[in-house]
UniProtKB/Swiss-Prot annotation:
InterPro entries: Rib_uL2_dom2 (IPR014722), Ribosomal_uL24 (IPR003256), Ribosomal_uL24_KOW (IPR041988), Translation_prot_SH3-like_sf (IPR008991). One of its GO terms (molecular function) is rRNA binding. This is Large ribosomal subunit protein uL24. Pfam families: ribosomal_L24. One of its GO terms (cellular component) is ribosome.
Length: 113
């Protein structure tokens, strides 16, 4: 399967009941693992961490908010020109003897880096 969404991309939540009603929210991709994606500021869950004191006498623990994974089909890449969700296509470019696959936004045709 081709990797259409990568770490650092700006994506928008397009659907999904497990996303906590965050349809339409945009954020940067923190990580991608298989068919799961972590989006910054979206699908936050609260983790309860046990309070632990380290050697210096400071303690850490309590409630911690962090992003949870969601299915990659629930997000779409944001077009850099229009700011709307778009599909991703691939172009094969040849320069000399090298061939490179480049992602592009299907709505505007602009190349994605």
């Amino acid at each position: 399967m081709s990797v259409k969404i990568r770490k650092g991309d700006l994506v928008q939540v397009i659907t999904g009941s497990k996303t906590g009603g965050k349809k339409g929210k945009q954020g940067r991709v923190l990580a991608v693992s298989g068919d799961r994606v972590w989006v910054e500021g979206v699908n936050l869950t609260t983790r309860h961490r046990k309070r632990v004191t380290n050697d210096k006498g400071t303690s850490s623990g309590g409630l911690e908010k962090r992003e949870s994974p969601m299915h990659i089909s629930n997000v779409a890449l944001v077009d850099p020109e229009t700011g709307a969700p778009t599909k991703v296509g691939f172009l094969v470019k040849t320069s000399g003897d090298k061939t490179v696959r480049v992602r592009f936004a299907k709505k505007s045709g602009k190349e994605l880096t």
